[in-house]
Amino acid sequence: MINIPITKILFLDIETVGGCPDFESCQKFSPEIADQFNKYFDWFLKRFPEDNGLTKDEVFTKRAALVPEFAKIVCVSVAFVLDNGETKKQSFSGEDEKKLLKEVRTLLDRCENLGFYLCGHNLKNFDIPMLAKRMIINGIR
């Protein structure tokens, strides 16, 4: 078993929303995203069989936040424990996703240089892939 001091762990969680409020507005303002969603629609119905019978708009509203191409990250919260046991927390949030992601990237780079490990619920299967893909989409390296 790996023994990592709690003072070397960065706890991380993200919150996402759909990039458009609904499919209709997505078709108007982001036709390329709407086209992508049309290609994904059958995948959504296979992945979430409970959504069979829902309209395309209902599926988009319910599931868009789960796929980086259709999502937007609105909040990233982190926490870590100091040597004296005190817990420090910080949240990055706002309408400007690119600015938020740049701030998070700066923090993650700093933590990597200090030898921190990341910890979070479903971090490997959701948070990290979502962060990475949204950073690529927003041109953040």
Task: Please identify what each model-predicted range represents.
Residues 2, 78-141:
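Conserved DEDDh/DEDDy metal-dependent 3′-5′ exonuclease domain
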Residues 10-11, 77-79:
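Short, conserved beta-strand segments within well-ordered enzyme catalytic domains
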